[in-house]
Amino acid sequence: FILFGIFILTEKKVAQPLLDLGIFKSKLFSMSIIMALFNFTVAMFSSILLPFYLQDFRNYGPGLAGMIMMAYPVAMLIASPLAGSAADKMDKEIVTFVGISGIVLSQLGYLLINPHSAPWLVVVILLIQGMSMGIFQSPNNALIMETVDRKYLGIAGSVNSLARNMAFVLGTSLATLILFTAMSNPVSYTH
């Protein structure tokens, strides 16, 4: 955090900054970046935690666990081009909002999972999450690129990629922290 603060202060003072912070003046750009960060962080949680739930808690074999997990990318594969096409014809903000709403719904769906849940429930939740991520991603990327001047397209794309990669790191770190804290509690390794 300290280095990030120093970076921001330096970028504000230099004549030719590495990252022109002026692009963040657009509320739509900033919100789209924050939403990308949020959504990819959330995506990493299920990618990290669900295999442990399916294999270690539910005692499913790797094959069945993998087949269940396939619901997410298959749904995303189907939804992404359809959402991109829809976003070209209607308001991208609405399509993005639908995607975000579906992601929130899928996360609430995980609250329904218990030790006796049928595998189809996990598949349905993953389908909703995958479709929602597919619906969200294309129009959100377009919003990010449309909200900046043409001369900042490279920077906007880089910030978008940075947000995605930071989300992968953040989501993986938080998910593994939660996982290993939960796994350590029964054997008294935390305290």
Model-flagged regions — what are they?
Residues 16-185:
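12-transmembrane solute porter fold
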Residues 2-12:
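C-terminal membrane-cytosol helix-exit motif in multi-pass small-molecule transporters
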Residues 190-191:
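Conserved small/polar residues in nucleotide/adenosyl-binding loops
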